[in-house]
Regions:
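Long, hydrophobic alpha-helical segments that serve as membrane-spanning/inserting helices
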Residues: 1-16, 30, 37-243
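Hydrophobic membrane-insertion alpha-helices, especially the h-region
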Residues: 20-34
Length: 243
């Protein structure tokens, strides 16, 4: 219909009408392209929103796990410190016995920081990392990953250096309770046997317990750093989702 109208205007030599027809065509094409562009951008933004929501969930779970790890290692530091004090005096009051038993039971237990990377790995694998427009957010994600990878290397080193001390401490103990047991669950004084007088006189035992505590504290520091980064990352994500 439009073509017939243009041809009629040409035959009539109505050049103004011809120009107007062409402007209508050009404007229609432009609007069509613009609508397609807007639709594509809206789809990209919707995809970014979904990624951010899933990423937020991963980071929130990571924070929860790391907070537990910090608390666990902080508790172990307190247990070990009290146990070392009691070994120095060679007296363990009844109210401290379970704490001392758990200082020995949990000796050297440390955990590296964690970051759930399901969404991050998906973004990298699909080439959609740039879908996240906020460069500060992309940088925060990259730094969080680098911290985890560095901490994993340090954890392996700490584990290797701390193992001889842990082995020595445990060689002086006898566990009386059999059966499966979670490594994070406390035991009772009655679940473990040792010669208190011998341990008090054994300077090597105290040094091994102290060294294991130091290595656990080292990993606790790395988890704390990662935790602070992840809290900051979560704030950036929340700010993006609020836009």
């Amino acid at each position: 219909m439009l073509l017939r109208r243009v041809m009629k205007h040409v035959r009539d030599q109505n050049w103004f009408a011809v120009a107007l027809d062409f402007m209508i065509v050009i404007l229609g094409v432009f609007i069509g392209l613009q609508v397609n562009t807007w639709n594509a951008e809206r789809q990209v933004r919707a995809g970014e929103q979904r990624y951010l929501e899933r990423l937020r969930e991963d980071v929130a779970v990571s924070i929860e796990q790391n907070e537990w790890r910090v608390a666990f290692m902080d508790r172990q530091d307190k247990y070990s410190t009290l146990a070392l004090n009691r070994l120095s005096s060679c007296v363990v009051p009844p109210e401290d016995r379970d704490v001392v038993a758990n200082a020995f039971f949990h000796v050297g237990k440390s955990l590296p920081p964690v970051l759930l990377r399901g969404v991050i790995n998906e973004l990298n694998a699909t080439g959609n990392f740039q879908t996240i427009r906020n460069s500060a957010l992309r940088e925060a994600i990259t730094k969080a990953i680098e911290t985890i990878e560095t901490s994993d290397l340090i954890f392996n080193n700490v584990l290797m250096r701390g193992t001889p001390h842990v082995v020595y401490v445990e060689s002086q103990l006898e566990y009386l309770k059999s059966g499966p047991r979670s490594g994070a669950v406390d035991i009772a004084w009655r679940d473990i046997a040792f010669d208190l007088d011998a341990l008090c006189a054994d300077q090597g035992f105290r040094r091994a317990l102290s060294a294991a505590r130091a290595y656990t504290n080292d990993m606790q520091n790395h988890v704390t750093v990662a935790l602070e980064q992840q809290h900051a990352l979560l704030q950036i994500i929340d700010a993006e989702l609020a836009k």
